[in-house]
Amino acid sequence: MLTKPNTNNTTSDKTPIMGATQTSVAQMVRYYNSKSSGYDTFTGENKKYNGSLAKGGASTIEQFAKIVYEEAKAEGVRAEVVFAQCMLETGFLKYGGDVLPNQYNFAGIGATGAVHGASFENVRVGVRAHVQ
């Protein structure tokens, strides 16, 4: 959580995880594009997973961000928090750790030290699991 000093010089004003989203799909897309390129393309050993996100229902970063926005809103979670955590966990959707792109696991759920963790049937279900 982000903290800001209040008038009493204490830190009680925090950015909540739950609540109304303070961003838009377009802002999430701009943020992604400022940090990464080649959506749904992978390098090295993960190159064989090129197109996995499209197969899972999100062929563009716009579609991916829209899914994040919709799933977060449905659960009362701020989409910008979900999106930021997803980008952190997946290296801006490039992966490279224990989780593979075709698992649609955007939060590293169940992944611990060489264990791939949970797999989900598509992007939306994976995002929903992350949000919940």
Residue ranges and their predicted role:
Residues 2-132:
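Catalytic cores of secreted/periplasmic lytic hydrolases that degrade extracellular macromolecules
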